[in-house]
C-alpha cells in the first residue's frame, strides 16, 4: 500500500498552489471552519429538519478539550438540528437498525458491516449531486470491495488494530498477538468486546484467516479465545479509555486512533503493531433505507468531507484520513504519526474484513456468546452451590433447635 507516499506527493503539489486559490469561494462558519461557497447550505433553514446521526463513541470533534464542535458548526450553517447518539460496536449498530427500535439518518459502520447491510437492503443509494465533496476522497480509498462503486457509502476514516500497553507495568514490550495468551499478563489483559475484532486476534495467533469460510474455522479460533479467557481482565469497548489511561490494566487491544488519544493522556502508554499483522478497517458514512431526510443527510455527509471539518475531526480522534486535502493541513505530530500512518512493512501485513456467509456469521455469533458466557456459567454454578450450602446450614440449624426442644420435653 502506498498511501503515505501518495499523501506526501500530494503535500508537495499543494505547496505549489497559490494561497489565494486555497481560500477562494469560502464561507466562514466559525473561527476554525470555512466551507465551500459553491453549495447551497441553507436550503433547509426554517423547515424544522432534524437529523438523527448515529456514530461510534469518541468519534467526532465535539468541542471538548478545546476542540471544534463540528455538529454545532453544521447546525449554525444549515439550520438543521442534529440529534447525535453513539454506539460501541458494529454489531450493536446492526441490531438497533434491524430491530426498527430507532430511526436514523446518518450512520457510520465499518466495511464488513456495510457489505452486510447492503446485501440486506438496509442502506439507501447516495445522490452524489448532493455530495460534491466526494471528490476530496483519495482514489485509493474509493470503490472498496464492501461497496464497489461507492453507491451507498463515503469513507470517513481508516484505522488499524494493535496492542496498547503500559510501559510501567510490563517488563518488555509485547510484539505478537500470541503474547496475549502469556500467563504473565493474567488479569491484566483487555480484549475487544465484539466478535469480529476479537476473532481476528485469535485468527492471527493461530495463523488462520480473519475472514473464516467454514464453521469449523470459527470453532477452532474461538477455542483459542476460550483458552485465553481466564487471563482476561475484561472485554471492553469505550471502557478501555478509563482503564488504560488510569493504569488499571497492563495491555489492551484497540484501534489506532483511540490509541493516539490514550497515549496523549497517559505518556506511560505505548503502541505496537503485532508481527503477525493487523486489520485495516474503513469506517464510512451511510444513510439507512428508512431515513426520511435523505437530502439533508447527504448535506451532512458533504459537510463532513469539507477540509476544515475533516481536519477538526481527525485531529480530535486521531484516526487516519482518507482525504489528502485534510492530511496536508494536519498538525505535524499527527501528520507523521507512525500509528496513524504506519510504514510500508506494516501496511504490507494489513488484512481487510469481508462479509461472512450467513452460516459462518451465525456460527460466530453463537460461539462468541458461548465463549463470553463460559465463566458466567461457572460463576452461576458456584452461586447455586453456595446457595445450596446456605440452605443446608439453615436446615441444620433448624434441626438442632427442634432436637434441643424435643430433648427439653423429656
Predicted features, each with a name:
Residues 15-29, 402:
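Sec-dependent signal peptide cleavage junction
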Residues 23-116:
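Early extracytoplasmic/lumenal segment of secretory-pathway proteins
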Residues 52-67, 88, 102-248:
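Extracytoplasmic ligand-binding site segments that recognize negatively charged/polar headgroups
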Residues 113-116, 245, 251-268:
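A ligand-binding cleft/hinge motif common to bilobed small-molecule-binding domains
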Residues 118-125, 145-150, 262-273, 333-338:
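Ligand-binding "clamshell"
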Residues 136, 159, 218-227, 233, ...:
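Periplasmic-binding protein-like
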Residues 288-349, 390-393:
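Mature extracytoplasmic/periplasmic domains
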Residues 344-410:
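Conserved C-terminal helix/tail region of periplasmic/extracytoplasmic solute-binding proteins
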Amino acid at each position: 500500500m502506498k498511501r503515505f507516499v501518495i499523501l506526501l506527493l500530494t503535500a508537495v503539489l499543494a505547496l505549489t498552489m497559490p494561497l489565494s486559490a486555497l481560500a477562494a469561494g469560502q464561507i466562514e462558519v466559525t473561527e476554525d471552519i470555512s466551507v465551500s461557497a459553491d453549495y447551497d447550505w441553507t436550503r433547509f433553514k426554517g423547515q424544522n429538519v432534524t437529523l438523527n446521526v448515529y456514530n461510534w463513541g469518541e468519534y467526532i470533534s465535539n468541542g471538548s478539550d478545546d476542540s471544534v464542535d463540528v455538529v454545532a458548526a453544521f447546525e449554525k450553517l444549515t439550520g438543521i438540528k442534529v440529534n447525535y447518539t453513539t454506539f460501541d460496536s458494529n454489531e450493536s449498530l446492526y441490531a438497533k437498525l434491524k430491530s426498527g427500535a430507532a430511526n436514523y439518518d446518518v450512520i457510520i459502520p465499518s466495511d464488513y458491516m456495510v457489505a452486510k447491510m447492503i446485501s440486506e437492503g438496509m442502506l439507501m443509494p447516495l445522490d452524489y449531486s448532493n455530495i460534491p465533496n466526494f471528490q476530496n476522497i483519495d482514489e485509493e480509498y474509493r470503490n472498496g470491495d464492501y461497496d464497489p462503486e461507492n453507491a451507498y457509502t463515503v469513507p470517513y476514516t481508516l484505522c488499524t488494530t494493535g496492542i496498547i500497553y503500559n510501559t510501567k507495568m510490563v517488563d518488555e514490550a509485547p510484539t505478537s498477538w500470541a503474547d496475549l495468551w502469556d500467563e504473565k499478563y493474567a488479569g491484566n489483559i483487555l480484549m475487544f468486546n465484539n466478535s469480529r475484532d476479537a476473532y481476528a486476534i485469535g485468527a492471527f495467533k493461530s495463523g488462520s484467516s480473519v475472514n473464516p469460510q467454514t464453521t469449523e474455522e470459527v470453532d477452532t479460533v474461538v477455542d483459542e479465545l476460550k483458552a485465553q479467557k481466564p487471563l482476561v481482565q475484561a472485554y471492553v469497548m469505550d471502557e478501555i479509555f478509563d482503564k488504560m489511561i488510569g493504569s488499571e490494566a497492563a495491555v489492551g487491544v484497540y484501534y489506532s486512533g483511540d490509541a493516539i488519544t490514550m497515549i496523549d493522556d497517559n505518556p506511560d502508554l505505548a503502541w505496537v503493531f503485532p508481527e503477525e499483522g493487523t486489520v485495516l478497517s474503513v469506517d464510512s458514512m451511510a444513510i439507512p433505507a428508512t431515513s426520511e431526510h435523505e437530502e439533508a443527510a447527504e448535506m451532512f455527509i458533504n459537510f463532513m468531507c469539507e477540509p476544515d471539518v475533516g481536519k477538526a475531526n481527525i485531529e480530535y480522534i486521531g484516526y487516519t484520513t482518507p482525504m489528502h486535502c485534510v492530511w496536508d493541513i494536519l498538525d505535524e505530530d499527527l501528520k507523521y504519526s507512525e500509528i496513524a500512518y504506519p510504514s510500508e512493512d506494516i501496511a504490507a501485513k494489513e488484512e481487510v474484513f469481508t462479509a461472512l456467509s450467513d452460516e459462518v456469521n451465525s456460527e460466530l455469533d453463537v460461539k462468541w456468546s458461548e465463549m463470553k458466557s463460559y465463566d458466567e456459567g461457572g460463576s452461576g454454578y458456584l452461586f447455586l452451590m453456595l446457595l445450596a450450602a446456605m440452605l443446608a446450614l439453615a436446615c441444620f440449624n433448624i434441626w438442632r433447635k427442634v432436637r434441643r426442644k424435643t430433648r427439653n420435653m423429656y
